[in-house]
Amino acid sequence: KEEVPVFLAQKIMPGTCKAVLTQPDGLKVDISNTSYLDYITNKSLPVVSMEKEELDTLPLRYYTITIPRGGEYSLTLSDGSILTMNSESEIRIPENFDKRQRDVYMSGEIYFEIARDTAVPFIVHTDRGNIKVLGTSFSVRDYQDETFLETTLVSGKIAFNQSEKEVYLKPNEQLRLNKENGETTVEMVDVRLY
């Protein structure tokens, strides 16, 4: 008789609410038990009275939210957009959105429900391209150690920009970008899987 090794499957636990906020000054704060907006609006900062024109000339300050392995986190941005972040993901968000466009910078996997504002587009920046949104629901998966960037559109309309090329997606479509050769493909998918 030949002995066959038996491998026991490791139990994979569902993600738990874990998040670390890095403030513009570099201070790291565990925000696992609070919402991002509650933290930002309730933190004790001195109130400074300034004219709107003065505020527009201030440099943008960014907060970074990092989700460790095994974590997940949902947050609502100041514009009403809702983000659901998966394990090992990161997003950089300005303290206040610019009046011309709403820019965020991400890596990992995030599901976006963007508040509609046709005058101020929402731009998701990744290492390989940008996604321009007017008001929609979609996901982006862009882990550093994976060959493909994927963005899947649930509703609305998005445009993926890479260098000089722009690709528009319709609901139920997924764009896959091969990070090694730059090729993009678009196909219909079951969005419930994403």
Regions found by a protein language model. Name each.
Residues K1-Y194:
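A residue-level detector for the "anchor" residue at the start of short, highly conserved motifs
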